[in-house]
Amino acid sequence: MAVPFRRTGKTAKRKRRTHYKLDNPALVVCKQTNNFTLSHRVTKNSGYYKGRLLLENNKIVKKVA
């Protein structure tokens, strides 16, 4: 079985690990409630998406294809 010829140094190991990081979610402001929400999703508080009411009391008001 193959083994590494040299030990991986601290700097090389840390440079490789810099890519394992979390990204901030893309938040946008809802026009109806002025709350932050995830982009391309229905606002949980108001039920609006792209200025149209889609949810009311957690029930689907209008289906969008």
Swiss-Prot record:
Q: Which UniProt keywords apply?
A: Ribonucleoprotein, Ribosomal protein
Q: Name one GO molecular function term.
A: structural constituent of ribosome
What residue ranges are annotated as transmembrane? none
Q: Which GO terms describe its biological process?
A: translation
- Indicate yes or no for the key word Ribosomal protein: yes
Q: Spell out the GO cellular component terms annotated for this protein, sorted alphabetically and separated by semicolons.
A: large ribosomal subunit
PANTHER family, per database record: 50S RIBOSOMAL PROTEIN L32, LARGE RIBOSOMAL SUBUNIT PROTEIN BL32
Q: What's this protein's family per the entry? A: Belongs to the bacterial ribosomal protein bL32 family.
Full protein name? Large ribosomal subunit protein bL32
User: What gene, per UniProt, encodes this protein?
Assistant: rpmF
